[in-house]
């Protein structure tokens, strides 16, 4: 790429294209990107910044919070609450929605985020990331309530994630394909490195936590068993397994070279539809993957068509290369 295109320029050009995105949405996304830069700085300091280890508290899901979970959550809230683009925010780390204080102007958008995905990897210096989703606030009533957030993923107006690894990379969609940006630390800006990211329809890689195999449902066991049989099995090819235990890192790899990611329902908590959060993880990642030519289902239906019933709803997730996702989904329906 001969000419360096910044995130700001990319978004301005998206705005100019027949008003593809409104100015307020463009400004909101720039603020989210700045917040991700701040989180990246905290992540990079590690032990030198005193940010490693647990915080001695639990989130709404009963998960032990790491210090960086709380720091990242605060960075996103403080960066976004005063800009006038938002009406409210929701976070995986907070019990209920966060209303923009009355002292700040109110916007028309709702921001949802997982401030730091892959928290188990923080202390061992493995890639982690931030996932975010933007919805339009319903305009049929004043104020904001939790029910305003309960929109299916096909109502998203923007979604993205930022992965904090050897490079800090921001991946974004506003409904017109997927673009990747890498943080130039010297300039302090995100620079476009790839547009129209595409996921190959076929793959030889799968990402799943094999230690849970005994707890899976039959269709998932069947799919993985066929992959493990390699060239001698029904698939006629050898597969490799990858598992980072960070959805951001696993999905980023799939966007870069293909693959299928699975976090299925299992028998340990049969009353729960899955482990991952629909609103903070599955919806934004599902839309990004679809915009890159992949597929995303819960094994039975398209993730983006699921009508959420509560803010912290969980869901089974199967996403990535289209033909592989369709195969697993077909096994669930008995095809």
Curated annotation (Swiss-Prot):
Documented EC number(s): 3.1.3.11
Cell compartment(s), UniProt: Cytoplasm
Keyword Metal-binding in record: yes
Binding sites annotated in the UniProt record for Mg(2+) 1: 92, 114, 116
Cofactor: Mg(2+)
PANTHER family in alphabetical order: FRUCTOSE-1,6-BISPHOSPHATASE-RELATED, SEDOHEPTULOSE-1,7-BISPHOSPHATASE, CHLOROPLASTIC
Protein's UniProt name: Fructose-1,6-bisphosphatase class 1
Species of the source: Polaromonas sp. (strain JS666 / ATCC BAA-500)
Gene name of the encoded protein: fbp
